[in-house]
From Swiss-Prot:
It is an enzyme of class 3 (hydrolase). Keywords: Cytoplasm, Hydrolase, Nucleotide metabolism. Belongs to the Maf family. YhdE subfamily. This is dTTP/UTP pyrophosphatase. Its main location: cytoplasm. GO terms for cellular component: cytoplasm. Nucleoside triphosphate pyrophosphatase that hydrolyzes dTTP and UTP. May have a dual role in cell division arrest and in preventing the incorporation of modified nucleotides into cellular nucleic acids. GO terms for molecular function: dTTP diphosphatase activity; UTP diphosphatase activity. It is found in: Cytoplasm. It comes from Shewanella sp. (strain MR-7). SUPFAM superfamilies: ITPase-like. Pfam families: Maf (PF02545). GO terms for biological process: nucleotide metabolic process.
Amino acid sequence: MNLVLASTSPRRKELLTHIGLGRAEFSFSQVAPDIDETPKAGELPRDYVQRLAAEKALAGLALCSGMSQPAVLGSDTIVVLENEILGKPVDEADAKRVLRALSGKAHTVMTAVALAKADQTSVRLVETLVRFCVLSDADIDAYVASQEPMDKAGSYGIQGLGGCFVESIEGSYSCVVGLPLVETRELLSEAGIR
């Protein structure tokens, strides 16, 4: 079986590498699927993130048509505050707006991971509660000026400078980074990939 990561995210690549525990025989390739990430009318955040992960895995599988027995991992992460999905910021003003909204509050990070093979697609959903400290305008301005939040759901990266804003988490740290390790290992194990 040939493992493929349907993502070009350096964070997901690094996390998937960790799953191999340094074994030389654990390897994977990457593809960049292109899907429409527009939420459907009335779609709940849990349903949305699971749908996107599955669609990414299936789109990645379609890109592997010449490969022998591909197994494709797709993943998607969203930040949810008061039932609103906070995606990647469209610009610096949007990033600042999102960070102000998160300031001093708890929000949920949802990451879904899907494994698609020729005959089936399996999906796991992981949710982690993240609590932010109160952020000053100066903190927000400096963080956005670093450009770190610009490609991240919820406008922050817990594994980088944005970790300074995290007061506590309840749940999976790797979920917040973008690929829940325990659940991904379970999916791979069930597919016979070790």
